[in-house]
């Protein structure tokens, strides 16, 4: 495992393989990390085919520095861009799982010359509003009055902040047409009970180019 120290002196944990051709970067989902089954499956494929590959932990996740509630989608976007700009070499294909699919779209918009393709695995861009609506009355009141609330999803408790929802709104990618001219693959299970099955259709409706 290696670490990249960003401008805030935070360490971002990552693992990489050196190989040939386009690079591949795997981006994990909310409250997941680079050691998830999907990330490791892609890594095995990259190793078998001798491809350049990077998986990393966003801050507040896995082995990277910080507490989850200290960061937002804006920070995790910066983490991905730091990996693209300072760790990865040359053109990249981004593979994003759930929230990682949102981050990959933000990165493709910010670094169009570097990103040559995107693969979304149950990609979940712009989920901030849906997540807020899933909160109960107590959670919503705490977010709006205290700025933070403890939320439990699928038996896993974590903290959500008012800033998290504000930054989520600022970073929406499907609010208007999303100009993108490179290959895009969206893989989504029809029985997914976390990310709605109409999300990939919404993405395709907004992507132009």
Located regions from the model:
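Short beta-strand element of the alpha/beta-hydrolase
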Residues: 21-29
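N-terminal cap/lid segment of alpha/beta-hydrolase-fold proteins
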Residues: 1-18
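Conserved alpha/beta-hydrolase
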Residues: 39, 43-65
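The alpha/beta-hydrolase serine catalytic core
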Residues: 114-206
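Alpha/beta-hydrolase fold nucleophile elbow
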Residues: 88-98
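Catalytic nucleophile-loop/oxyanion-hole region of alpha/beta-hydrolase
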Residues: 62-87
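The serine-hydrolase catalytic nucleophile loop
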Residues: 31-43, 198
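Short glycine-enriched nucleophile-adjacent loop
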Residues: 101-112, 118
